[in-house]
Structures are given as C-alpha cells and as structure tokens.
Amino acid sequence: MKTKFRLREKEKIFKNIRENGYAILHNIYSKKRINRVKNSLFSMLNYIKFDDKITDLQEKYYQVKDYNPNLKAHFYDMCAFELETRLALHDPIILDLVKGYFGTDVLFSGRPAIHIHDSENERFLEPHQETNMFSKDFLFVWAPLYDAKNDQGGLLIYKNSHKHGYWKHKVDNKIGSTNINLKKLKKF
C-alpha cells in the first residue's frame, strides 16, 4: 500500500478538491487495515448477540437488528469510539494529505462515523452538508469497507456545489434531520 503521495500526486488531488469539491483516492487502505475495522465492528456486534455460526459482518448486523433494534442503535453510536476506525481515519497518509492541503502542521479531527447502508433504515439522511464541524474549512474522508455499487453503499456528491458556500437547510423530514431542498440541487 502507498504510504505517502508524491508532490505531483498531491497537487492533482488538491486541484480536484478545489475544482470539483472532492477527490477519489483508490486503494488507500490495505485489505489488512479494512479487515481490522470489519473484525472490530463484528466483535462489537457479536458481544451484543453471540453466535459462533455467523461470521459475516453484514449478516451479523442484521441478526442484531432483528434481535434488538435499540442495541443495534447503541452499536451505531458506539462506532464513533471504536479504535480501528479511528486509526484508519488518522492513518499517516491521510494526515499528510490534510496537512498539505491546508498548509499546516496543526490538525483537529472530528469523530469518525459509520454509514450502514440499510434500505429499511428510518434514519436514512437526505442530501445535506456536513456543517457541524470545528471549522468552515475541513475535509470529509469517506472510505467504504465493501466495494460500493451504483445503487448501494455509496455516497452522493454534488460536483461543484461547494463553490456556492453553505446552503440553507430545512428540518421537514420524518426524522427531523437537516436537509437541502432537492429542487435547488437539480442544477448539479
């Protein structure tokens, strides 16, 4: 796995972020690193509902969800404190990129979050901006644990929307989360 980007590679990444609002970095994490995150999440779920017959993280998630939705929700909340995810977020290659992008050695980090693609999830978020950050200047890092497909497990990014600053959000959906009027996003 790559441990550092060359200066030219960094400049290309930074240009993509400035122009498009994002950059796609392929294969940043090794399979070993991803498996450590998956295994840790699996262990958390297996602690909630032990079953030595199930060894797949996704299957385990649905088992816990069926067993006790409240405990599944607590698992989701606890993921922000799970160390393997934090280690991945704070991987030296990511930190080096962020320092280079902002031209600083001083970094602050938010908490990692897990997005679980579950079509039955009532807390599915509508289009929104990540606005609850330390600063207006930040980079959002998203790394799938499984290969993302067009119709699931992905993240929708509205190219160039970052050039319009912060959008007015509303709170009119069934879960009371902030979201952006979809009509305004049609131009992207």
What are these regions (language model features)?
Residues Q129, A143-D147, K159:
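Short, structured patches in soluble enzyme cores that scaffold and shape functional sites
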